Structure formats: C-alpha cells, structure tokens
Regions:
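Low-complexity, polybasic segments enriched for Lys interleaved with small residues
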Residues: 18-63, 67
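Rossmann-like dinucleotide-binding core of oxidoreductases
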Residues: 64-80, 84-105, 192, 199-336, ...
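Beta1-alpha1 glycine-rich phosphate/pyrophosphate-binding loop at the start
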Residues: 71-164, 266-267, 333-339
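Short beta-strand to alpha-helix junction loop
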Residues: 134-153, 165, 242, 314-322, ...
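Feature captures the FAD/FMN-dependent oxidoreductase FAD-binding
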Residues: 139-205, 379
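Alpha/beta-hydrolase fold catalytic core
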Residues: 321-394
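Glycine/threonine-rich phosphate-binding loop and adjacent beta-strand/alpha-helix elements that clamp
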Residues: 397, 401-475
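C-terminal active-site-capping segments
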Residues: 462-465, 469-552
Length: 552
C-alpha cells in the first residue's frame, strides 16, 4: 500500500490492525478466529446436562438450512458502501448482521478494475473515510491497487471478515409484510432472512458492452476494462480501444508504450483537465501520523476546493466558462495538430458529461503508433473493426473501455415489496427514492448510492458517509422501537422527487448531451443537483413523520 512493507495505515478511531496483506494471511476469507476451548464441566453440571439433554433440539448438520432466527441487518455488497455500513453498525453495537458478496474478495469496483493505470480521479485524502484516514498514501491521487489495500485494511481493522459471506450471489429480495422480514434468495444456497436489508452493491458493478454488430464474430482477443486479462501480452500487437471515457484515458497511455499500433475509436470527445498528482514525501506521511489534525485540515481544504468546483460543473455560470477555458488551454498545450484538436474539443457544456482528469492522455494520442478514429463503428468482423467509411481495421486485440451499466432504471435482481410490488417495474422509466435511501412500498430497505445520490464535483465517499449515517438512524428506529415495518410515505417521496427534478432541469447534466447520467427518455436518476454540503444537510435529520410504521 505504501512505500515499505513495514509501513501501515493508522487511525485515531479504528482499532489497531495488522497491515492488510498480513491480515489476509492470518485467516482465510470468511473464516472466524478459532475460539479458546471451553472450561470443563463439573460433575454437577454434567448431571444437569443429562437431565435436559432430551429437551434440547439436536445440533443441525453444516449442510442443512441455517437457523430460523433472522439477522438484524442484511447487506448486499462488500465494496466501500457495504463495508462502511458494517462499520457503522459495529460502532453502534449492532453485531447481528451479514454481508453477502457475490465475488471471492472485498473491494467492489476496485477489486474488478485492475486495468493498467487504474486510479482515482479524486485526491486520496478525500477518497477515504473520515473516520479511518490513511496517512501513508503514496501519491496525491492513488492507484487502484493502493485503494484496494486500504479497503482490506478496513476489513481487518474493524473485524468485518467474520460477517462476510463470499460467493453469495443474491438473485432476489422478497419482503414478508406479515413477519416484517426480507428474504434474500441466493444462487445455489439456502435463503437468508433479516429484519432490514441494505442494498450496497454500488452503481459501478456490471460491465457494459457497446451495442455493436458482430462482437461475437470477432476472432481476436477481447478484453473489457472491468475484466482485465493480465496474462495477455500486448507487446507488438495491433490493438484497438473502444471508448474515450474515464477508464480509457488511463488505459491508453499505458498501452501505447507496449503495442505495435493503437487505434482509439472515439464517439464523443470529453472535457479533460490537468491532474495535479505528485508523490507524497516521507515528511508528509510522518506529519500525518504524528499530528492527525494536520491530515484532517488537508482533507477539509480539499473538500472546500471541490465544493467550489460545483459552480463550474453543475450549473451554467461564469465559472463554467472559466473551466472550459482552462480545459481548452490544457488541450492546446498538449495537442498542436489542428485537426486532432478539433476532434478532441467537445461541443457540449463542461459538466454535461463526466469531466476527465489526466496529464498523459493527450500526449499518448500524439504518439507515432497511435491513431484517433472518429468514424462510427459499423461492425466487428472476424479480423477487426469496420467503420462507417468502409475501412477495415485489422486487429489482434479489442479493448472495450466502455465502463459500467449504471442502473438508472430497473434493479440488478428482482426486489419485491408490499402487496406484490416489483421495484424493477416501478423503476422502468427511471429510479426514484426518498433522499436516495428509501422507496415507498419497500419497508425496512435502505439503498446506498441510490437514485440521485451521485456527485459531480466532490468525493463519492463524502456523500456515502452521509448516507451511512441516515441509514443507521433508520435501522436504529426499526430495531430500538421493535417495529415490524418502517416505510416512507408515498406523498413524502413524491414531493421530494418533484422538487429534485425541478432543480435538475437547471443543471448542466440536463443541458442536452447524451450521458450515462440520463435514461433514454432524458430522466436524471443519477445525480444530486447541489453542493455536497447541501446533500449532507439533507441527510442530517431523520424525520419520523416522513415514515409510516407498524409495531411487532
């Protein structure tokens, strides 16, 4: 994670922990620590045990159904969101929870995205939990492997591994209104029940492939950025990259140094701004470890700097024009060819699509072995890609840097609420929720990174922490008051979303370009139309009057 094997993350609030890699060696994933042997029974106790033995139920075999008693909370997903929720529950004294993870390790998008150059476009000191700071980040913008190490640290430091069930793929969630329980149907396993369910699988979990004819016909190597094949040797190969989004601008500079030729197929150019990345000096790490308040001050400064950026990317303001001028200057400095510069200049307002951060993307496109192709792709043939101008591009490998299928509508699996309601059907034209967390008709269910919780300018983890606190308040209300149902009122949800969409209509996201923020009908179910400070204020209070409840 950091520069030496001996270095490790430290935090004021988290318990001391072995460094992530060492911790992983101490216990296999999903296994509990071995308990000490119980003390021997006295003769009197043995006699008492014999008298009551006939009354006790026989011990169930390991292969039989789990105990009937449901868990308090069931969490779907072991990425940042799911682990963050688990930490909040543990710190609140709620230990009876289980995390269901379809993969064989934690990490979510950072476990899956291991392509060359994978990194975060938010500064490391802001892309981490405020309650578990890492003083040992190696760079101001850390790579994916280092972020994954941080996630493993969270599991170790907060004792989460015993709660995680790996290779547990949820295929459906069903609510039993009579008992007030959610049942998780699992692929090839017995179902699990809980009083509350938390959907924490995140929006960036399912790889998206473009709708192009002939994908199955192509006989060469196919690699998706979210399913990278590290065994494939790119040396001397003729390679194509489809897409010029966030993953592509990181992959292209890495591949260009290895391949014989690189063809970049661009549908729409993006706004690209410089990335102020630098190596963290040792004295800086020492200062953060010795004086944690100094790191908190840096985090606070980064937070407010990014809050200022909201004026540029969310709404059309003088700062928007300034941001566009800075992006154009970045392009002019790095690309001298007039034709290429025109092809790389967007025709939409900055912020309408995701703004990219890179220092080496433009220089990579100028390499002698790189070709930028802006003709639409007609189809994939057996040997390569055919573009709309009739040119056949013969290739050894096609890289799909086409991101994720972000759920703006529907659900990743059936979610059935009260009275036979099915969430996928209700969200078919666009997802809606109350404060991005709760959905009317689906009691005791909490979403993390739910509808309209996306940040356009600040750290996703800032938004996530606000969601964790709000969801925890709901779980506390449910458990502490021994409720069977806790369900947001439909009128409250409708009023909230009416105001939300009215505000979204005035944002750059809704200014006319096509992006993954919007549904095909132009409905924005993804982004929050405001500052992170406004989002946090919205999530700071849990109004009991906004919810219907029913006691057990």
């Amino acid at each position: 994670m950091s520069e030496t094997d001996e270095s490790r993350i430290t935090t004021n609030e988290a318990p001391a922990a072995t460094p992530p890699k060492a911790a992983a060696r101490k216990a296999a994933p999903g296994k509990r620590a071995v308990k000490k042997a119980a003390p021997k029974k006295t003769a009197a106790k043995k006699a008492a045990s014999k008298k009551t033995a006939s009354k006790k139920a026989p011990r169930k075999a390991a292969t039989r159904k789990p105990a009937a008693k449901p868990a308090s909370v069931l969490i779907v997903g072991a990425g940042f969101a799911g682990l963050g929720m688990a930490i909040r529950l543990k710190k609140a004294g709620i230990e009876d929870f289980v995390i269901l993870e379809r993969g064989d390790d934690v990490g979510g998008t950072w476990r899956d995205n291991t392509y060359p150059g994978a990194a975060c476009d938010i500064p490391s000191n802001l892309y981490s939990f405020s309650f578990a700071p890492n003083p040992n980040w190696s760079h101001s913008y850390s790579g994916g492997a280092e972020i994954l190490d941080y996630i493993h640290y969270l599991v170790s430091a907060f004792g989460l591994r015993e709660h995680i069930r790996f290779q547990h793929n949820v295929t459906a969630l069903d609510f039993d209104a009579r008992r007030g329980l959610w049942t998780a149907e699992l692929e090839g396993r017995e179902p699990l029940r809980a009083r509350a369910a938390v959907m924490a699988q995140g929006p960036l979990s399912n790889a998206s492939f473009p709708d192009i004819d002939g994908v199955e016909d192509y006989q060469g190597k196919k690699i998706h950025s979210a399913r990278w094949d590290h065994d494939y040797d790119f040396t001397g190969k003729r390679v194509a990259v489809i897409g010029t989004g966030a993953s592509a601008v990181q992959i292209i500079p890495e591949l260009v140094e290895k391949v014989r030729s690189l063809k970049v197929f661009q549908r729409t150019p993006a706004w690209v701004i410089p990335r102020p990345d630098f190596r963290t000096p040792d004295w800086n790490k020492t200062l953060f470890r010795a004086l944690p308040a100094s790191q908190r001050a840096v985090r606070e400064a980064l937070y407010w700097t990014h809050e200022t950026m909201a004026m540029a990317v969310i709404w059309n303001s003088p700062l928007t024009r300034l941001a566009e001028r800075l992006a154009r200057r970045h392009l002019r400095r790095q690309v001298t060819d007039d034709w290429m510069r025109r092809q790389l200049t967007p025709d939409f307002r900055i912020g309408c699509k995701r703004v990219l951060v890179s220092n080496d993307y433009y220089p990579a496109l100028r390499k002698d072995n790189t070709q930028l192709i802006t003709w639409p792709i007609a189809k994939l043939s057996e040997n390569g890609i055919r573009t709309a101008d009739g040119v056949e591009h013969e290739l050894d490998c096609v890289v799909f840097a086409t991101g994720f299928d972000v759920p703006k509508s529907g659900t990743p699996f059936p979610v059935r609420g009260r009275a036979g309601r099915e969430l996928g059907e209700e969200w078919a034209r666009g997802a809606q929720a109350y404060k991005s967390i709760n959905v009317a008709g689906y009691p005791n269910l909490f979403f993390l990174f739910g509808p309209n919780s996306g940040p356009g300018h600040n750290s996703a983890l800032v938004y996530m922490e606000a969601q964790l606190d709000y969801a925890l308040r709901g779980v506390h209300r449910l458990l502490d008051d021994n409720l069977k149902l806790l369900d947001v009122k439909p009128t409250v949800q409708a009023r909230h979303n009416k105001q939300l969409q009215k505000r979204l209509a005035r944002t750059n996201w809704n200014s006319g370009c096509k992006s993954w923020y919007l549904t095909e009908d132009g409905f924005n179910a993804t982004m929050f139309p405001g500052f992170a400070t406004q989002y946090r204020a919205q999530m700071a209070t849990f109004e009991d009057g906004d919810y219907d409840s029913e006691p057990r």
